[in-house]
């Protein structure tokens, strides 16, 4: 854990304890390529060394894959997911070709190449064994959800526009969930 993470944990712990709230630990370990159990264990040891206590057991995302699967099933039932067969390099090339590619806060957004594929085209690619990720059709999802907001204790009602993130990936071929989906499910649970 680096100093910034330690500071954030101390700040969150103090804020929770000051108002009688709960301080919970969640290990976001779904990326098996970068996450190691030893890293997670070291984080817990560091928090303990800092003298922090937490409410409930340490939650590990890798223990909750079934919950994320149920969330994907629900999104599929709402017809807001679609398979995306594009590789990262294909997406970069498509964005480079577009003069005015849409951009979010973290750079260019997915251009929606596979969003416009027909059901037959999607089925044919899947039948050929083409790997794919599942993306959230943000336009459809926002039409179902309507305006979104959240409450900040200091600033009051704050509008939220997830459409700025574009059609996010909710599951990949190598991981049954994505960060975007997992943190939403976990935030709701916690």
PLM region spans:
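N-terminal Rossmann-like or analogous alpha/beta NTP/dinucleotide-binding catalytic cores
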Residues: 1-102, 188
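Active-site cores that bind ATP or allylic diphosphates and position pyrophosphate for catalysis
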Residues: 89-190
């Amino acid at each position: 854990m680096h100093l910034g993470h330690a500071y954030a944990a101390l700040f969150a712990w103090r804020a929770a304890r000051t108002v009688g709230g709960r301080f919970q630990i969640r290990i976001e370990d779904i990326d098996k390529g970068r996450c190691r159990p030893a890293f997670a264990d070291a984080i817990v040891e560091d928090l303990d060394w800092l003298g922090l206590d937490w409410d409930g057991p340490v939650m590990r995302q890798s223990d909750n894959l079934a919950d994320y699967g149920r969330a994907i099933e629900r999104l599929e039932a709402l017809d807001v997911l679609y398979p995306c067969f594009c590789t990262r390099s294909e997406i970069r090339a498509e964005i480079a070709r577009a003069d005015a590619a849409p951009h979010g806060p973290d750079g260019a957004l997915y251009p929606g190449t596979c969003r416009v594929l027909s059901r037959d085209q999607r089925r044919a690619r899947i039948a050929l064994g083409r790997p794919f990720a599942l993306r959230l059709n943000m336009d459809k999802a926002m039409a179902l959800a309507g305006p979104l907001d959240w409450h900040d204790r200091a600033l009051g009602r704050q509008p939220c526009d997830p459409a700025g993130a574009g059609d996010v990936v909710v599951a990949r071929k190598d991981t049954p969930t994505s960060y975007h989906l997992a943190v939403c499910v976990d935030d709701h649970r916690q």
